[in-house]
């Protein structure tokens, strides 16, 4: 199930959960996740961001539509590579790019600017 991220309270809860999880078992993606979240807010068609829910909590999967291209994208954490992946269309789509804290904000901006 998903929830529309239509207000700052939902986005705040999502960011809080991402940072909590990154402090426990994904220490190498917290800063990159915050950069990516800001970039998605910049690029997304207003009202298009959806966040997966799991047992009533917000989970690590996000779907959004680009305001510029109207294409759909999915973001999820890959537990094997310990990176966040941006995928084409869905969480099963082609990986467009992967990021971690080693990815510079400039690189994330460059990758997002093409979407």
Where are these regions (language model features)?
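N-terminal non-globular leader segments, chiefly Sec-dependent signal peptides
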Residues: 1-54, 109-115
């Amino acid at each position: 199930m998903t929830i529309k991220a239509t207000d700052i309270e939902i986005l705040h809860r999502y960011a809080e959960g991402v940072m909590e999880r990154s402090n426990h078992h994904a220490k190498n993606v917290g800063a990159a996740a915050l950069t990516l979240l800001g970039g998605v807010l910049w690029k997304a068609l207003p009202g298009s961001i959806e966040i997966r829910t799991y047992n009533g909590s917000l989970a690590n999967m996000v779907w959004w539509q680009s305001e510029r291209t109207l294409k759909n994208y999915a973001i999820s954490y890959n537990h094997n590579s310990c990176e966040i992946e941006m995928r084409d269309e869905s969480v099963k789509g082609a990986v467009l790019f992967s990021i971690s804290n080693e990815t510079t904000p400039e690189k994330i901006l460059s990758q997002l600017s093409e979407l």
